[in-house]
Amino acid sequence: GGGTGQPLDWYEYDLMENPYQQLVVWNPDAEEILGGYRYILGDEVEFDKHGKPVLATAHMFNFSEKFLKEYLPTTVELGRSFVTLEYQSTRAGSKGLFALDNLWDGLGALTVIKSNVKYFFGKMTMYPSYNRFGRDMILFFLKKHFSDKDGLITPMVPLEIETDPAILEKLFCYDTFKEDYKVLNTEVRKLGYNIPPLVNAYMSLSPTMRMFGTAIN
């Protein structure tokens, strides 16, 4: 999962007057935490004196008036997510298979409790150590199939794709998500990498997902 890497993972947005909340997945039998999400409800977001939303992503992205007025009130911003080491599939075996599903169940429960929620918004992290060509393929693929044509949210300092666009256009030349995804999965694996789990998960969850660009955090 994401986080600061420090023994205590909190920051200013956990301590402000109207802080982010924590969705926690709990195993009642073992009495232990499986994972969690940091989140804030859009209709509870406050604005600073410049009219800018007080959000963890506000230092990286510009939010259009259309997004702030028409989308934010029915949106949940998702922050750091994690699955505890004991429940990560590489070391947990069968009990780790459903940890991520349990997180989705928690988000689903949140939409039942807060019936006005229509959208989830947040960032997915790709670390600098990830293969650059692999990263460029993923970004190109996401932009092709999930682009934000309305300009709802834009990165302040966009991270540009370094690979020649002609190479990527030749690779991802199909009309459907499914066919292009096969290419993406195959080519990334050739590099000795996997598509990051959350990227895979979000793409599979919703065909109406939008990708708002890439920024350096």
Task: Name each model-derived stretch.
Residues 1-41:
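Short amphipathic alpha-helix that is part of the acyltransferase structural core
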Residues 44-214:
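Acyl-donor binding region in acyl/amide transferases
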Residues 3-10, 207-216:
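Short, well-structured beta-strand/strand-turn elements
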Residues 15-24, 47-48, 209-210, 217:
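A short helix-loop-beta-strand connector motif used in the catalytic cores of GNAT acetyltransferases and
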